[in-house]
UniProtKB/Swiss-Prot annotation:
It catalyses: tRNA(Cys) + L-cysteine + ATP = L-cysteinyl-tRNA(Cys) + AMP + diphosphate. The modification Phosphoserine is found at S270. A motif ('KMSKS' region) lies at residues 266-270. This is Cysteine--tRNA ligase. Its main location: cytoplasm. InterPro entries: Cys-tRNA-ligase, Cys-tRNA-synt_Ia_DALR, Cys-tRNA/MSH_ligase, CysS_C, Rossmann-like_a/b/a_fold, tRNA-synt_1_cat_dom, tRNAsynth_Ia_anticodon-bd. Monomer.
Amino acid sequence: MTLTLYNTLTRKKEPFVPLEEGKVKMYVCGPTVYNYIHIGNARPAIVFDTVRKYLEYKGYEVQYVSNFTDVDDKLIKAANELGEEVPVIAERFIKAYFEDVGSLGCTKADCHPRVTENMDEIIDFIQTLIDKGYAYEADGDVYYKTRSFEGYGKLSHQSVDELRSGARIQVGEKKEDALDFTLWKAAKDNEISWDSPWGKGRPGWHIECSAMARKYLGDSIDIHAGGQDLAFPHHENEIAQSEALTGKPFAKYWLHNGYINIDNEKMSKSLGNFVLVHDIIKEHDPQVLRFFMLSVHYRHPINYSVELLENTKNAFGRLKTAYSNLQHRLKSSTNLTEGDSEWLEKIEEQRKAFQTAMDDDFNTANAISVLFDLAKHANYYLQEKNTAEHVIQAFIQLFDEICSVLGFSLKEQELLDKDIEELIEKRNEARRNRDFATSDQIRDQLKSMNIILEDTPQGTRWKRGES
């Protein structure tokens, strides 16, 4: 089956044909690093990491770029509130981001460009737009002349006139038209800034991604992706900037993941109902959170609650049990061949079902259903009096194959010594801070992994329990 994906630009599923055969250039909008990421930030990280993994599974060479916005209004506000420098805060939360998404099974992008490290390219991009008549300077600010770009609105499927009716010029803005948007902001007093032809300032949000995508991936890319909330105005404005500058299509396919609701309400900071990944993975297996995110098609909204996550944990546990039973039975299996072709055919059918699911716009929900079907077949097979080693190996291999694409593992994780030492140090720190709930949670976590702790006057000792 041919891989098809839903393109927001055309509002339909299309066969995937990359610009260059066998290669995929992919850009995913990353976070603004002023705090720990919430589960709304985690969803695109997980979803598009899975898209990347499946493209690689199909044999494509994927060049994957995802940025960090490490200077903007939110970071400046956080810096003022905390009495710290913007780069210090950005660095702290970039480190935290890698820790969080790493625990969720996300592979690092080939490149994670930062706005502050690409300022020359951003300034050059803006100057070229001015030279071409698509932008103008006004008292140190630079604005994009939206009506000058003929295709504006093609991603969000809105006409300029429709957009104009809701547009307003805010106090302090010097734009000529309410539809125009900021490319460069003149610096305020005591605010982080960079020199430019228009005076000291910093870039607007939209220009950053256009400039960095072009620098690291070229004028035209295959896939541009992000959350549904970015389609307008962010991605719409990226198209206007990039295509005005190059005269070429910016991205062939636009992918957007759906919203996350918390207990059936849309997640928002105004409602105070956002949940940090940092907090969830203190109490829940990060793999379960990833499994939960992929259990719904990426374009559909997903409802999060602790109860639903617990249900997911139980479902994930059933798969781990089936996998564990296969590994255990492997030790007593023989070279039996009678009836094995029938079981091998069933396994191959499940492989094809997985590929069919993923070829249909990366339908991870259906792919996970295939895992449960595979587990059901495995459980039936294990009821046989005699089992063949190569059949069990085939079951295990397909489980591993599917899970490697979906980004989790059914294997029991054995902690490395350094990981154990790090957990013990976190527990000791919690005890020093009289955070006994965290201390007990880490002890229980280690106990579940067969690690036995002994607290002594000289410190905490540990050993692995008997298998």
